């Protein structure tokens, strides 16, 4: 048990290296022969060659595999099983993955779709399947395939329940249960449960108002044109499946990086551009960027901020109040009340990170961790402070009739009204409300925030700062887990950041975000290695990309632009 605990603590600093076997093959003596497939440059293929191919290429190989004579007859059932299962994986949008891909490198959405493909292959009936946002990370083309797969599961005689924000998924459903009316304490009720058409006709449903077009995310009346003098140029990007890509990124604009899954978006932006900028601007030395030859224009920026969906903290002590800097002035207010001064309490008395005012039984966590060894750890409320984090003496100090625990239990909206007369607090709390987090509690544990909520807390922190207008913000699918109304709020925040002169780069599949961009860089045409992806196939305004032949993003974008309303000037 002790060894397991030690391994868990050391795991974050482990480095994975390729084993020194011939071509890192793992199993390098197994061979398969294919005489007809044009993919083969020789008659024999080693097992590790096949497992390293994209699934689409692997499927083509097995479909054309000719073993000859009775060997073909013996292998027929096995080959049928292999091709069917590969087909299921491709139909859920995973054509760019390889069989050798390590499970720990898969995103949550990819892992979920692999499990979905295995269920389709099992052919079970009478099963209830529950999926939580399966569209995460999927291009619109792959999303259509996914919806077809879910309908196939239903047609087999199963029940399919999907928690989803995607408009196409909602419209494709047989039955929709809409929760609300708001988020957090303002939600929790079933507003309406009916067909998508009935949902769209429901005035009380925010989802329905967006489905009916009464509420909408508008196309901007005027897009910010690119300035040829303000360009960031990255040359020779060749990491993973990138084909010697030259990226010309206009600064001061909102730029969307698009393309089907596996086309190289994350490699180009997260693994190459972001790491170069973090190394050269932020003086970060942790990670080396993927291969490239040259970068020009970084002198026009002073820092890069990667606003991702990673947690804002990994312990119960981390919360929105501590992350955004709201907690320090709150503690100063409590330390300044007359009773605190009489007792000699300073600001540290109201911290749950140091001894003095905190509950020592739980060391200010409010909960106790129970290690389960082979299962996720369980947190139970502290029996001494009952989750209040502080000792009795500290909780006796009141500010405007509330103790420190009661303030941390307030929602952002309640705290904004409570501290309205304190400009420092009011301004920071307003930014949290601006990004749609009015329902979150100030002291809510970081471990309970979703990825989308954590990302918006980070955006709120950036909004509250005074900046120089020379910052590069990188966001990777910020719409994950967001409702239409939340996306509208997110776009308002991004517009404010851009309005200060900053540059925004967004890796995104959501067409409502893409259509509002000033500039689009589309990668593809397909995903994976070989001739699949890794090239820039279209760039320009959304209208330019929509008119580009051969761009899947352009095909879907043209339909959205034709059916969307333009904002009033």
Curated annotation (Swiss-Prot):
Domain ABC transporter positions: 223-550
GO terms assigned for molecular function: ATP binding; ATP hydrolysis activity; DNA binding; nuclease activity; zinc ion binding
The answer to whether the entry has keyword Zinc is: yes
Similarity comment text for this entry: Belongs to the ABC transporter superfamily. UvrA family.
Q: Which GO terms describe its biological process?
A: nucleotide-excision repair; SOS response
Spell out the protein name for this chain: UvrABC system protein A
Cited function:
The UvrABC repair system catalyzes the recognition and processing of DNA lesions. UvrA is an ATPase and a DNA-binding protein. A damage recognition complex composed of 2 UvrA and 2 UvrB subunits scans DNA for abnormalities. When the presence of a lesion has been verified by UvrB, the UvrA molecules dissociate.
Residues in C4-type zinc fingers run: 359-385
Main localisation, per the record?
Answer: cytoplasm
User: By its UniProt entry, which SUPFAM superfamilies does this protein fall under?
Assistant: P-loop containing nucleoside triphosphate hydrolases
User: Looking at the keywords, is Zinc-finger present?
Assistant: yes
Keywords in UniProt for this one?
ATP-binding, Cytoplasm, DNA damage, DNA excision, DNA repair, DNA-binding, Excision nuclease, Metal-binding, Nucleotide-binding, Repeat, SOS response, Zinc, Zinc-finger
UniProt subunit comment:
Forms a heterotetramer with UvrB during the search for lesions.
**Where does it reside?**
Cytoplasm
Q: Which CDD domains match?
A: ABC_UvrA_II
Which InterPro entries does the entry mention?
Answer: ABC_transporter-like_ATP-bd, ABC_transporter-like_CS, P-loop_NTPase, UvrA
A GO CC annotation recorded here is: cytoplasm
Binding locations of ATP: 259-266
């Amino acid at each position: 048990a002790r060894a397991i605990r030690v391994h868990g603590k050391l795991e974050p600093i482990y480095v994975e290296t390729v084993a020194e076997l011939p071509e890192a093959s793992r199993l390098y003596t197994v061979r398969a022969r294919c005489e007809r497939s044009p993919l083969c440059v020789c008659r024999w293929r080693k097992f590790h060659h096949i497992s390293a191919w994209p699934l689409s290429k692997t499927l083509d190989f097995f479909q054309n595999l000719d073993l000859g004579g009775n060997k073909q007859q013996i292998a027929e059932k096995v080959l049928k099983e292999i091709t069917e299962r590969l087909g299921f994986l491709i139909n859920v949008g995973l054509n760019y993955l390889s069989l050798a891909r390590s499970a720990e490198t898969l995103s949550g959405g990819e892992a979920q779709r692999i499990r979905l493909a295995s269920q389709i292959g099992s052919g079970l009936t009478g099963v209830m399947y529950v999926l939580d946002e399966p569209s995460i990370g999927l291009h619109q083309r792959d999303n259509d395939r996914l919806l077809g797969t879910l309908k196939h599961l239903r047609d087999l005689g199963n029940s399919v329940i999907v928690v989803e924000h995607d408009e196409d998924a909602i419209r494709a459903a047989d039955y929709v249960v809409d929760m609300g009316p708001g988020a957090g304490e303002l939600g929790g009720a079933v507003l309406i449960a009916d067909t998508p058409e009935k949902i769209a006709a429901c005035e009380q449903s925010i989802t329905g108002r967006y489905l009916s077009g009464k509420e909408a995310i508008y196309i901007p009346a005027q897009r910010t044109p690119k300035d040829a003098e303000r360009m960031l140029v990255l040359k020779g990007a060749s990491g993973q499946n990138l084909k010697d890509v030259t990226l010309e990124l206009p600064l001061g604009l909102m730029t969307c990086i698009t393309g089907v899954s596996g086309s190289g978006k994350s490699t180009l932006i997260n693994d190459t551009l972001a790491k170069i900028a973090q190394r050269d601007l932020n003086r970060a030395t942790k990670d080396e960027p993927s291969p490239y030859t040259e970068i020009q224009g970084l002198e026009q920026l002073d820092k890069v901020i990667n606003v991702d969906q990673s947690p804002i903290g990994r312990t119960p002590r981390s919360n929105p109040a501590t992350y955004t800097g709201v907690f320090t002035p709150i503690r100063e207010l409590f330390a300044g009340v007359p009773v605190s001064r009489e007792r000699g309490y300073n600001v540290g008395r109201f911290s749950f990170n140091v001894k003095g005012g905190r509950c020592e039984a739980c060391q200010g966590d409010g909960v106790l961790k129970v290690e389960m060894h082979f299962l996720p750890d369980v947190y139970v409320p502290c029996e001494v402070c009952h989750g209040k984090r502080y000792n009795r003496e500290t909780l006796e100090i009141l500010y405007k009739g509330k103790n420190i625990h009661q303030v941390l239990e307030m929602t952002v909206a309640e705290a904004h009204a409570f501290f309205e007369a304190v400009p420092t607090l009011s301004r920071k709390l307003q930014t949290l409300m601006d990004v749609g987090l009015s329902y979150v509690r100030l002291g809510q544990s970081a471990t309970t925030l979703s990825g989308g909520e954590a990302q918006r807390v980070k955006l709120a922190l950036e909004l509250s700062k005074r900046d120089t207008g020379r910052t590069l913000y990188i966001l990777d699918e910020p719409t994950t887990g967001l409702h239409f109304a939340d996306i509208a709020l997110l776009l308002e925040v991004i517009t404010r950041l851009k309005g200060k002169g900053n540059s925004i780069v967004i890796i995104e599949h959501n067409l409502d975000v893409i259509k509002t961009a000033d500039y689009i860089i589309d990668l593809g045409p397909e995903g994976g290695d070989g001739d699949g992806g890794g090239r820039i196939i279209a760039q320009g305004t959304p209208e330019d990309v929509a008119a580009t032949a051969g761009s899947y993003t352009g095909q879907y974008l043209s339909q959205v632009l034709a059916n969307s309303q333009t904002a009033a000037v």
